[in-house]
Amino acid sequence: MFSCQSLYKFSHSFRKRIPVMFQRAQQKSSLLHTQNESSHQPSLNKLGGFSSASLNFNSSRSSTNDDQQTFSSQSDNLPSSPITLPAKRGRSAASLKQLDNTVGFDVSKPSLPVFENSGLGSKYSTEIANGVYIDENDFDDDLLLENDIDQKPIPWSSSPIEHTKLTKSMLSSEKRSKNHLSKIYEDHTSEKGASSVISSNITRQGIKRSRTLPWAVDPYRYGDPDPKRTSTSADISQHTVSNDSSNKLSNGRSSSLDSLAKKRMSKSKSTPQISKKFSVPLNSASKSPIGSSLFKTSDSRKKSVPSIFLSDEQKRILDMVVEQQHSIFFTGSAGTGKSVLLRKIIEVLKSKYRKQSDRVAVTASTGLAACNIGGVTLHSFAGVGLARESVDLLVSKIKKNKKCVNRWLRTRVLIIDEVSMVDAELMDKLEEVARVIRKDSKPFGGIQLVLTGDFFQLPPVPENGKESKFCFESQTWKSALDFTIGLTHVFRQKDEEFVKMLNELRLGKLSDESVRKFKVLNRTIEYEDGLLPTELFPTRYEVERSNDMRMQQINQNPVTFTAIDSGTVRDKEFRDRLLQGCMAPATLVLKVNAQVMLIKNIDDQLVNGSLGKVIGFIDDETYQMEKKDAEMQGRNAFEYDSLDISPFDLPDVKQKKYKLIAMRKASSTAIKWPLVRFKLPNGGERTIVVQRETWNIELPNGEVQASRSQIPLILAYAISIHKAQGQTLDRVKVDLGRVFEKGQAYVALSRATTQEGLQVLNFSPAKVMAHPKVVQFYKQLASVNGLPIRNENKAPVQMRGVKNK
């Protein structure tokens, strides 16, 4: 009945364990016989044997209380010349060699039970005392085996997974012996999803490796049968089954999930998996276990990247750029989402040209703006330097640089941010250079333009005291652009009254009511958390002086963080020039209690412009230990204002700080990072360990000309109005007596989100200046209320011949 011809397929390590298994079986079989003599027959799942065809009795299980299995009538006969296996067998080489030559096993009595329906009679139904019993230790490593389901199953295995695999021949065999399968409708699986009896067109799915013992998964598998199960129920299959009749049992009955299995499955699905990483709650509240969350910036960014949601007018512009391929200029007042929309346009265009990344050139008029969007300056892209030469000389200069020529030839879309600071002369020169280099007579050589900026903000830098012309005054503006669009919905300020005041300030036409309201904002604002408003100055000198003065007032040791600069540009002087506009400084000096500003988005709560205070410097190991200790004690990690011990600290706080100091000393060689407590817009707090981030100056082909790795923090006591352009600040202090340029007052005051967070000193309507040409240019946009204005001087898009390949 059982043959061992396929024993050679076993692994060497598995064969070594077989003698031990039989030795253990001999010792336990007598005890098993004594215990079960007056009760039901033991489960066939506890018995072992060899079959050259299959173990189809292992693929399902009876629901009756005796938990018996029925053999197929197609089973092989017993071996004609069995050999006797000694009760005690060593692991000698001779013994293994004898085992390899074995064609069957005989233990003096029938080693396997034969039941009534097997066709072999019932006289052996009680003679199972010497049957082979498989101990749970034999299952230790079998579940790690991975076998192909399409291959013929091995004759016998201690792994329950092997008993579930049926081939086409097994199914046909079961169909011919249908009368013997009336009690075998349940499969031989656990609740984690093993295999039902399925058809030959089964789709193989990788077996999940596990060391879990089968009876630890299903208590009814190797003991008494589950009384809740019926003969028509079957566990859900782990394999993928087609939608046809392949999910039917071979006897024609449908495989269904019984109520207990459903309960188990739903429980396993609903139970959350505990992550080893620290999860960051987003509903932070002040001084609460959730509100004072602690995490590393690198972890948080992977978990929660700020999502970009576009308004209808923003979606319309995105469609005009990506789908309709129009050359456009979109603008809007401060806080209308120009930067958000531009980042989305860049993201979608790069995805569209992902196989040809150099087709999209991302540039900006200034190094700061270019660094913020991951691009390069317009001058660097064009290869024109200061562009003071004639067009012919510029073309000759560009042709000497093969990389620069290739950029011009490969570019399909040219993006220019902060175009308001590009003068008309430079724009016209670049347009002619593009036509000459690309040998294309179409405007800008057939390149699609995406321009954005606000001409009411900072104007082009005048050269040699000569006032520069605005970009919209250039000939290129009239010939190359299809549409001009103005964004109207303000996101930054929710107060309609404040929005109205800022719009009047932008146009340079303030009403008496607005003047009165701005003058009221000269009061001093006191904040309970001790964080000061950020002062905006028109010059870098004033910014450095203010920050230095504040830092000298802090009686703490300074900690210096030096940026790590790299890139394809080897000339340090040139690379430093490229990184000069980067928001991250080359050298950052911090102290405990220093006020800082985050200059990169971390998640939906901690964004560019968030204010915080340095409460200490710790290494990553100390951070992890303190976090775990706080979780175990049910408290907030780093719930104190400083890691240094103060005479005013309570005893329990001192004890925690002493422990922290000990941990820091134990890892004194590790790098210490700033530990910063940030203030959230909703009034809550978040304490994070801030580590290095990277800013790239990147060419369209992906080449990183310059890169800076630095802590994403700056001192927040003061920043320049120029660097504040594009920022959103909750607390702002501005002295308008210092402004000297048109648009500076508007840029500075429009950084604030509310009137409550804005302090204005020396306000005077005379300081509110808007250029008459800019006012006239925007009158057209105001008249159409955000609708696109077509450039009638521009040729239709299809005539430009810019098509996707």
Curated annotation (Swiss-Prot):
One of the record's GO molecular function terms: ATP hydrolysis activity
Annotated GO biological process: DNA recombination; DNA strand elongation involved in mitotic DNA replication; mitochondrial DNA repair; mitochondrial genome maintenance; mitotic recombination-dependent replication fork processing; removal of RNA primer involved in mitotic DNA replication; replication fork processing; replication fork reversal
Highest taxon in the source lineage: Eukaryota
Catalytic activity line of the entry: Couples ATP hydrolysis with the unwinding of duplex DNA at the replication fork by translocating in the 5'-3' direction. This creates two antiparallel DNA single strands (ssDNA). The leading ssDNA polymer is the template for DNA polymerase III holoenzyme which synthesizes a continuous strand; ATP + H2O = ADP + phosphate + H(+)
Record's compositionally biased regions (Low complexity): 245-257
Root EC class: isomerase
DNA-binding region: 744-763
Modification type Phosphoserine: residues: 80-81
Gene Ontology CC terms: chromatin; chromosome, telomeric repeat region; mitochondrial chromosome; mitochondrion; nuclear replication fork; nuclear replisome; nucleolus; nucleus
Listed result of changing residue 508 to E: In pfh1-R23; cold sensitive for growth, suppresses a temperature-sensitive allele of cdc24
E.C. code: 5.6.2.3
Biased composition, class Polar residues, residue ranges: 66-83, 230-244, 268-282
Transit peptide (residue range): 1-25
InterPro entries per UniProt: AAA+_ATPase, DNA_helicase_pif1-like_DEAD, P-loop_NTPase, Pif1-like_2B_dom, PIF1_helicase, PIF1_RRM3_pfh1
UniProt-annotated stretches for the region Disordered: 58-91, 217-282
CDD domains named in the record: DEXSc_Pif1_like, SF1_C_RecD
Oligomer and partners: Monomer.
Family under the similarity heading: Belongs to the helicase family. PIF1 subfamily.
Functional description taken from the UniProt entry: DNA-dependent ATPase and 5'-3' DNA helicase required for the maintenance of both mitochondrial and nuclear genome stability. Involved in the maintenance of mitochondrial (mtDNA). Required for both repair of mitochondrial DNA and recognition of a recombinogenic signal characterized by a 26-bp palindromic at sequence in the ery region of mitochondrial DNA. May have a general role in chromosomal replication by affecting Okazaki fragment maturation. Required for the completion of S-phase.
The name this protein goes by in its record: ATP-dependent DNA helicase pfh1
Record organism: Schizosaccharomyces pombe (strain 972 / ATCC 24843)
